[in-house]
A protein has these predicted regions:
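Non-catalytic interface/targeting segments
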Residues: 1-81, 87-88, 113-133
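Mid-chain, well-packed structural core segment of small domains
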Residues: 80-107, 111
């Protein structure tokens, strides 16, 4: 499922971001570097598709899959594409992320966490909800 993008802002119409962004109740938008139903097992540099979840204190819902190559702009660097397509997310769960991309994501308001590496996505999201919401 791919969300529609607002022509003026480029934001997803399904957006329910967190912290300094417009919120929809107590929902946190989370990007996961892993396979659906699997584990947080993709390195930042090796991810091809991000799973996007809306997370609340009581449940989570997969709302979108974002493929980097499909969303990249012409001549856009890979890191820039990733930062842009995750800008509506408050958190990125990833197996490993280097200092430079972590800083770029933080500047865009995305907290990149590798503390859930190797964990199954379901339990990682539940633990994240307990910590953040």
């Amino acid at each position: 499922m791919q969300a529609m993008r607002d022509a003026d802002t480029g934001r997803s119409s399904m957006s329910s971001p967190f912290n300094n962004r417009e919120t929809s109740g107590d929902t946190l938008r989370v990007a996961v570097a892993g396979n659906e139903g699997g584990r947080v097992d993709k390195h930042f540099g090796a991810v091809e598709i991000f799973l996007i979840y809306d997370l609340s204190a009581v449940d989570h819902k997969l709302v979108e899959r974002r493929a980097i190559d499909q969303l990249a702009l012409p001549d856009e660097e890979r890191r820039a594409t990733i930062v842009r397509i995750l800008a509506d997310c408050g958190v990125l769960l990833v197996e490993k992320v280097g200092a430079a991309p972590k800083k770029l994501l933080a500047e865009a308001g995305v907290d990149a966490l590798d503390k859930f590496k190797g964990r199954d996505i379901e339990s990682a999201l539940k633990e994240l909800a307990a910590e953040y919401l």
